[in-house]
Every structure is written in C-alpha cells, then in structure tokens.
C-alpha cells in the first residue's frame, strides 16, 4: 500500500485541478490533465463527456465561472502508478446556494507527475425520483 506522501500528492493534484478549473486557468488545468487520447471527463450535464483537450478548451472559452466546485472529502487509493479517488464535495454559486456533488477520478503517473486521466461528477437523485 502506498504511503501517505503519495496520497497527499494525489489530493494536491485533485485540489489544484479544481482550483484551476474554478479560476478559468486553462494553462494550469492542462498541466494537471493527462493528454492521452482515451482520457475522459464526465460532468453532471448529459452532454458533458469530454477529452482532456475539450475540458481545457471549454475552460479557456468560459474563463472563471460563478459556479465553483469544492472537494470536501476524498478516499484515495494507490496501486503503483495508478491512483483512484472517490469523494463528496459541493457546487457553490457566487450569489449564494450550493448543491452536494459526488466525484470520482483516476490518476496515472506520467513522467513522475500525477495526471488526471478520468473524472466524473454527479448530483445524486433518489431512486424513487428516477422514473417518478
């Protein structure tokens, strides 16, 4: 099992990825995401199923957003050069209000640096509400 140092590194990448996305810092975000063609990032919107390049392009076009993503708690697991994490966070609005969000991600170590190769965010819906 990987030590706390590696977990701290992975958590730092997760936090810095969200900070870059929240700030609209496309260059910084690009440095955190894997450029593998099979990298995928799935958002809460039904149409958000993107490559790393598409995510960076969207952030560059939008700049900072009034909706911010915050990672509150994460469990991080590491096996060699692969790490995965699941946790809870929230989306907050500049004008007030927030929604809980569930997040997962997979990171791989590329050239000694942890990079996000997969991410997913979802807002939970009670099973009874799926089909009403």
PLM region spans:
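Short, well-ordered beta-strand segments in beta-rich or mixed alpha/beta enzyme
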Residues: 17, 29, 33, 41-43, ...
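Residue-level preference for beta-strand/loop junctions
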Residues: 67-68, 81-83, 99
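Short, cysteine-centered beta-strand-loop-beta hairpins and adjacent loop/turn segments enriched
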Residues: 64, 91-98
């Amino acid at each position: 099992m990987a030590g706390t140092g590696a977990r701290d590194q992975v958590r730092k990448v997760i936090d810095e990825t969200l900070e870059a996305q929240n700030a609209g810092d496309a260059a910084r975000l690009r440095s955190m995401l894997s450029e593998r063609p099979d990298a995928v990032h799935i958002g809460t919107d039904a149409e958000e199923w993107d490559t790393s390049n598409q995510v960076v392009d969207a952030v560059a076009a939008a700049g900072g957003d009034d909706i911010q993503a915050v990672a509150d708690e994460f469990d991080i697991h590491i096996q060699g050069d692969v790490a995965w994490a699941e946790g809870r966070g929230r989306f907050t609005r500049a004008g007030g209000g927030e929604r809980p969000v569930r997040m997962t991600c997979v990171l791989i170590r590329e050239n000694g640096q942890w990079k996000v190769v997969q991410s997913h965010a979802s807002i939970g819906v009670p099973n009874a509400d799926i089909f009403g």
